Curated annotation (Swiss-Prot):
Keyword terms: 4Fe-4S, Cytoplasm, Disulfide bond, Iron, Iron-sulfur, Metal-binding, Methyltransferase, rRNA processing, S-adenosyl-L-methionine, Transferase, tRNA processing
Residue ranges occupied by any Radical SAM core domain in the UniProt entry: 98-332
Name recorded for this polypeptide: Probable dual-specificity RNA methyltransferase RlmN
Cofactor binding note of this UniProt entry: Binds 1 [4Fe-4S] cluster. The cluster is coordinated with 3 cysteines and an exchangeable S-adenosyl-L-methionine.
Protein localization: Cytoplasm
Pfam family, one: Radical_SAM
Positions of the catalytic residues: 92, 337
PROSITE patterns, alphabetized: RADICAL_SAM (PS51918)
Further comment found in the protein's record: Reaction proceeds by a ping-pong mechanism involving intermediate methylation of a conserved cysteine residue.
Cellular component terms (Gene Ontology): cytoplasm
InterPro entries tied to this protein: Aldolase_TIM, Methyltransferase_A, RlmN_N, RNA_MTrfase_RlmN, rRNA_lsu_MTrfase_RlmN/Cfr, rSAM
Gene (name only): rlmN
Disulfide bond entries: 105-337
Function: Specifically methylates position 2 of adenine 2503 in 23S rRNA and position 2 of adenine 37 in tRNAs.
Organism field: Synechococcus sp. (strain CC9902)
Amino acid sequence: MKNVLLGRSAAELEDWAVAQGHKSFRGRQIHDWLYNKGVKSLSEISALPKQWRTELEAQTFRVGRLKLVHQSVAADATTKLLLATDDGETIETVGIPTDQRLTVCISSQVGCPMACRFCATGKSGLQRSLATHEIVDQVLSVREAMDRRPSHVVFMGMGEPLLNSEAVLETIRCLNTDLGIGQRRITVSTVGVPKTLPQLAELAMEKLGRAQFTLAVSLHAPNQQLREELIPTAHAYPYDDLLDDCRHYLDLTGRRVSFEYILLGELNDHPEHAAELADRVGGFQSHVNLIAYNPIEEEEFKRPTSQRIEAFRRVLERRGVAVSLRASRGLDQNAACGQLRRQHLTGSDLT
């Protein structure tokens, strides 16, 4: 959006200031106020001449910040924000704190077209993709809400990032160069869109110089048949083709791929499933991240027992697969993996 300043680099803001008839240092001042001070309107940038601020607002230039609609905090301090865009759409983003880090789980679209059966986001379909400033804002909003500098960012909120790759990669550039978050601390999660992984690698090298962020591919099943049952769009992307594209991505970037696997009680969590998964990803420079299912209202999937989770993990480890188990955070506020939607909690009811 040409009149929005958030999301622009220091160099872009310097050039823009010169084009407006001012010195380039004014662009650097704006950059500081956008990313370090987190202003929400041009009128707040007191370092700029008042007359110029008035002129810019008259020309409809704006910062591009979103509006905080609702904030909820879980018992474990995980914080979920409902944010409104200028056109009235809403998205959710989550801040996940530990003693050592603050991870922000951000959305790349309003809703999601992938319709994974175990995920709340896809139940309402896709409204539109988010612009760069709308994605960047989520990190700033969490920073403000939690009064803490984010250390890690994961594109695991609402939407399919590879259906909005231009804005996602520009956001990564902004997070890296403007907010100082290292690429290796950024993860892009995808359920898989045919032919996009090699394109992502090439576009990342063009825009970022190197693709150093982590790619996380959501498998959630050890074979094509079961994957299609859980992920309707998987019918267009055969399992072997997806893994071949992951290998191609690895060859292009030199970066290990992470595979995500949601464990659904007595559906995809048998030891036989673990053995089949190990056969698929074994000998591959990769890592498997296990995620216990987080309940949503519309589905009757079960969260697996801790015994079944541990048995699944042991099978992978015995077969030489690097594996970890993601802790579920924010469950009591519907802020955990797979639970995000465009709503907030009022008492015990979704509104």
